[in-house]
């Protein structure tokens, strides 16, 4: 039973980081492309668009950091292992 929990934790950590990483990268690319297009249409609003883009990128990156934190907890400090041993 303990081996299955370890295997499931490794697979879950790998898939979660990979999937969230791909989606976060795509979301950041879409946000940047939209910001560049908006600045090209309205150059006078460039400072406000830049500020909003940085907030959006920070929120997107926060999701990735939370996922990485959960994956590292599953790999190195798994709370399920203490209950099974």
Curated annotation (Swiss-Prot):
Superkingdom, taxonomy of origin: Bacteria
Topology within the bilayer: Multi-pass membrane protein
CDD domains: ATP-synt_Fo_c
Residues that span the membrane, as ranges: 1-21, 53-73
Keywords: ATP synthesis, Cell inner membrane, Cell membrane, CF(0), Hydrogen ion transport, Ion transport, Lipid-binding, Membrane, Transmembrane, Transmembrane helix, Transport
GO MF entry, a single one: lipid binding
Function: F(1)F(0) ATP synthase produces ATP from ADP in the presence of a proton or sodium gradient. F-type ATPases consist of two structural domains, F(1) containing the extramembraneous catalytic core and F(0) containing the membrane proton channel, linked together by a central stalk and a peripheral stalk. During catalysis, ATP synthesis in the catalytic domain of F(1) is coupled via a rotary mechanism of the central stalk subunits to proton translocation. Key component of the F(0) channel; it plays a direct role in translocation across the membrane. A homomeric c-ring of between 10-14 subunits forms the central stalk rotor element with the F(1) delta and epsilon subunits.
Protein's name according to its UniProt entry: ATP synthase subunit c
Source organism of this protein record: Dictyoglomus turgidum (strain DSM 6724 / Z-1310)
Gene that produces this protein: atpE
């Amino acid at each position: 039973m303990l081996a299955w929990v370890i295997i499931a934790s490794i697979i879950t950590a790998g898939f979660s980081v990979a999937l969230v990483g791909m989606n976060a990268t795509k979301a950041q690319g879409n946000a940047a492309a939209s910001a560049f297009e908006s600045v090209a249409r309205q150059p006078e609003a460039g400072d406000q668009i830049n500020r909003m883009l940085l907030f959006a990128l920070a929120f997107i990156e926060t999701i990735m950091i939370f996922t990485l934190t959960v994956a590292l907890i599953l790999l190195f400090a798994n709370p399920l292992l203490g209950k099974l041993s």
